[in-house]
Regions:
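Membrane-proximal intracellular helices of multi-pass ion channels
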Residues: 1-444
């Protein structure tokens, strides 16, 4: 594969961490070069580090408008970083090794398993091939559909490039766009009622956020829902609910002064995009604080494990809900679809939830204190970073050095995963053969 995968003294978590960090630093250096900016000058390192982190961590928060600041070379660098970040650094490395005919060792297969949240090492190479074919098919289909609109509006070959760029950006849940030539940082607001743009980008976001294991499950079992793994069922149902319920709220309680068609399309899209994509067709600054809070919650929850999406993952949220229901019903275990949740799964979910909440809250408070901005605005920005979403209420470009570093840290944390970061930096405790005595404490 790549050299760092041969370091046997590194754990899988450390390899994943090092891989993402290496790609981010390389991307930052390339974006610094005068050839990357339209002005032909060097771009400050902290700004390119921010942009590279945002691209690799498929976030979409930007300090410069992508269409007007970066040259074609810079845009290609950003798109490459997005594709690597969306697929995962280890998956890309494995794909290169497979295509070059190199043999993948057992330890490398184990790292690949951890990187894509696969249930077992067996069949991991075949599964990686399935991922590559699926990504190619989905992104090419998305590019073809979007090019119909963009070639009409921007001509050829500019429209074709925009179709490719936005297809990859949407599928990888990145949120970078090239539509700022007329109005900088406008995202997809010019296409709020365009059915091709809304449906194509919306479904690319959803497909990317479902996870590759879910793809494989659906392809293998077709429409026989009862045959799916419990994880796939939970992901599909929670995804549907986390899109439908917010969409209904947005339609009936937000954007009430807009025409029906704009409100209908906008409500649906604004409930899809917080699943870590970062595109918007309506301005989130026009939402009430309740709407912004709901969006922040959706951003922190994110998409599915083993997907192009970030966040703490909808399965984590679903496990916490199941455990709460079990407590209310005085049952010993949480369960879904006739299957009991394991104790280890519950412990992992609680740890992940606490990690993400602590990072999200601390980041928002630091930005609010340093920038002297309203807390809800800073929490929105923090949720966007830790959930690797890219939505903003318009403060990103005006942030100072400390706030940029906070967001860079949150984006990196949100993409590699809280537990991966912990496992990579903190040595594991020794497993004792004996267990300590148990004693109950009162809670609640």
């Amino acid at each position: 594969m790549v050299p760092f995968l041969h370091k046997k003294h590194l754990s899988s978590a450390q390899i994943i961490l090092a891989g993402f960090a290496a790609v981010i630093l390389l991307g930052a250096w390339l974006l610094m070069l005068p050839i990357s900016s339209r002005s032909g000058t060097w771009t400050p390192f902290l700004d390119t580090l921010f942009t590279s982190t945002s691209a690799v961590c498929v976030t979409g928060l930007v300090l410069y408008d992508t269409a007007t600041h970066w040259t074609l070379f810079g845009q290609i660098v950003i798109l490459t970083l997005i594709q690597i970040g969306g697929m995962g650094v280890i998956t890309v490395a494995a794909s290169i090794a497979m295509l070059s005919g190199r043999k993948i060792t057992l330890s490398q297969r184990s790292t690949m398993q951890d990187a894509i949240s696969a249930p077992q090492v067996g069949g991991i190479v075949r599964f990686t091939g399935f991922i590559l074919k699926g990504i190619l098919l989905v992104e090419l289909t998305g590019a073809a559909l979007l090019s119909i609109v963009f070639i009409r509006d921007y001509g050829f070959p500019r429209g074709l490039w925009m179709g490719i760029f936005h297809s990859v950006s949407a599928f990888c849940n990145a949120g970078f766009d090239l539509l700022g030539e007329k109005v900088p940082f406008s995202s997809l607001t010019a296409y709020v009622t365009n059915p091709i743009v809304n449906l194509t980008i919306g479904h690319l976001i959803i497909l990317g956020g479902l996870g590759f294991l879910t793809w494989e499950d659906v392809c293998r079992n077709k429409w026989h829902f009862q045959k799916y793994r419990m994880q796939s069922k939970v992901i599909l149902v929670s995804t549907a609910l986390l899109i439908t319920i917010p969409a209904l709220y947005f339609f009936f309680f937000e954007f009430n002064d807009l025409p029906f068609a704009v409100r209908a399309w906008g409500s649906w899209f604004q409930s899809v995009t917080p699943r870590t994509a970062g595109f918007n067709t309506l301005d989130y600054a026009d939402m009430s604080e309740v709407g912004q809070f709901i969006t922040s919650a959706l951003m922190v929850i994110g998409g599915a494990p083993g997907s192009t999406a970030g966040g703490m993952k909808n399965t984590t949220f679903a496990v916490l809900i199941a455990c709460a229901v079990a407590v209310f019903q005085k049952r010993k275990d949480g369960h879904y679809f006739g299957r009991r949740l394991s104790t280890d799964t519950v412990k992992d979910a609680v740890a992940i939830f606490l990690l993400y909440m602590a990072t999200f809250l601390l980041g928002g408070m630091i930005i609010s204190r340093v920038e002297n901005l309203p807390l809800i605005t800073c929490f929105f920005e923090s949720a966007s970073a830790v959930g690797t979403v890219g939505l903003t209420l318009g403060i990103t470009t005006s942030l100072g050095t400390v706030s940029k570093i906070v967001l860079i840290t949150e984006m990196f944390f949100g993409r590699v995963g809280g537990l991966t970061l912990i496992f990579a930096t903190i040595p594991a405790a020794k497993n004792l053969l004996s267990r300590l005595p148990e004693e109950k404490i009162a809670v609640g």
